[in-house]
């Protein structure tokens, strides 16, 4: 099982999502549970981002993605962000 850790930005985004986007928040919770077991496969079309070395992404809804890194040696998944799309500026 992987340990899950969150950036400050991701933590703030998740709180916002919990209040204003209940369907997306529900999907996020399911994805986080999957990340604990298998961070490279599962729902949300997991993909390694081409232009961000070591960063993975999963689709939460049409607009939002969860971005994360995986450290196999520490058995840790670090969530970078949970709102927006990685191409958003």
What is the predicted role of each segment?
Residues 2-5, 36:
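Generic alpha-helical hydrophobic packing signal
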Residues 33-59:
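A short, surface-exposed loop/turn module that caps and links secondary-structure elements
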Residues 1-3, 15-26, 30, 59-89:
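Enriched for short, Lys/Arg-rich terminal
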């Amino acid at each position: 099982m992987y340990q899950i850790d969150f950036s400050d930005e991701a933590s703030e985004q998740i709180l916002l999502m919990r209040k204003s986007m209940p369907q997306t928040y529900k999907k996020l919770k399911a994805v986080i549970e999957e990340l604990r077991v298998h961070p490279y496969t599962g729902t949300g079309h997991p993909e390694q981002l081409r232009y961000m070395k070591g960063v993975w992404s999963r689709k939460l809804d049409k607009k939002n993605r969860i971005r994360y890194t995986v450290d196999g040696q520490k058995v840790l998944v670090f969530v970078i962000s949970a709102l927006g799309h990685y191409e958003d500026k």
